[in-house]
């Protein structure tokens, strides 16, 4: 798996899924997960972006609350994911996104796309 560790400005370390394209990158995209974590769906989006020439990085936005959280889409998993949102802090989330952007900044222009949690 293509995991890396990011360090936010406040010193917190979080995991991110990162994929690089073959050849010179066209830029980079930060992929903000759904409430289900950096699961296989989010990883597949990153993989497709890399196939199209972009460095793609998906920081694990729940690592501060529930490290390595990822789930599927059953009603029980939806309930669990929604419960995590009660503890989600936007200020620290922005620090984590900034760390992700910094990790891929050498690829050129950096965009961001969000799904559910970040959409």
Where on the chain are the PLM-derived regions?
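N-terminal cap/leader regions of alpha/beta-hydrolase-fold enzymes
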Residues: 1-119
